[in-house]
Amino acid sequence: MNIRERKRKHLEACLEGEVAYQKTTTGLEGFRLRYQALAGLALGEVDLTTPFLGKTLKAPFLIGAMTGGEENGERINLALAEAAEALGVGMMLGSGRILLERPEALRSFRVRKVAPKALLIANLGLAQLRRYGRDDLLRLVEALEADALAFHVNPLQEAVQRGDTDFRGLVERLAELLPLPFPVMVKEVGHGLSREAALALRDLPLAAVDVAGAGGTSWARVEEWVRFGEVRHPELCEIGIPTARAILEVREVLPHLPLVASGGVYTGTDGAKALALGADLLAVARPLLRPALEGAERVAAWIGDYLEELRTALFAIGAKNPKEARGRVERV
């Protein structure tokens, strides 16, 4: 199966298949925001503005990486980018590996024309560093007119796919390439970063990490849908670090590094919990896929509702901004 066909099948699985975790949850349900009835705060005072990767976002929100390089990629990415521009939030692009292999795929990623001011983050698998070097990374970011580059690390997904399954020496390889002339972050894809993973990254000059915990989309389930047309190994596909635990573990090891929480953080209230646990930003991907097929307005409406819920949740706990949410949570 070529890479373009695989991307098409990924979209199909995410739209039609049962690719969410079936048993594993984000763990956010195990925490309760500490409500404050006398915080002395006005809702209008709650300011979601958040600096990230050299830009100032109007809210601590990123559109998660989804696609590019297949037939619907351009349509989806343009809708997502238009919404990001309108709302002042950031956007992660889908994996750019296909661009390095097939430069003609650039059209489906080229969104800067509709998002001239938005934060755009290019994306490449960490495992691709076995075949690509510094010049390739510079070329990728330049072609996409991106502001930053995220390396995704996804060993379970690759193993189920029977893709790039040799992850030896990749942290050392990344260390050789850094620093680059733009911010670099590392992210999982939905199975979570652990304390041990954070320790492995601790000495690198990274600009951020995205814990991408378990509880939302299981990319192992996606790959089984693509490979078999069904999920044959459901227990295997439940492996991962729940999002809440991933936030706590990574924040303990990396106390000052900007931390993105994704992985089933699908409501503004859960977003507030993630911020309270130690995240700086939130990212959402799959729930925006179908709205993106319907257009930028639908994407903007979904995100707008999310951010209004987030703002209200912060108000309810007496937090004037995302930073003030830190610690305003308790275990149930």
Swiss-Prot record:
Mg(2+) binds at E158. Its cofactor is FMN; NADPH; Mg(2+). Optimum temperature is 60 degrees Celsius. Its EC number is 5.3.3.2. Homooctamer. Dimer of tetramers. One of its GO terms (biological process) is isoprenoid biosynthetic process. It is found in: Cytoplasm. The keyword NADP applies. It comes from Thermus thermophilus (strain ATCC BAA-163 / DSM 7039 / HB27). GO terms for cellular component: cytoplasm. Keywords: Cadmium, Cytoplasm, Flavoprotein, FMN, Isomerase, Isoprene biosynthesis, Magnesium, Metal-binding, NADP, Nucleotide-binding, Plasmid. FMN binds at A65, M66, T67, S95, N123, K187, T217, G264, V265, Y266, A285, R286. This is Isopentenyl-diphosphate delta-isomerase. Substrate binds at R6, K7, S95, G96, R97, Q157. CDD domains: IDI-2_FMN. Pfam families: FMN_dh (PF01070).
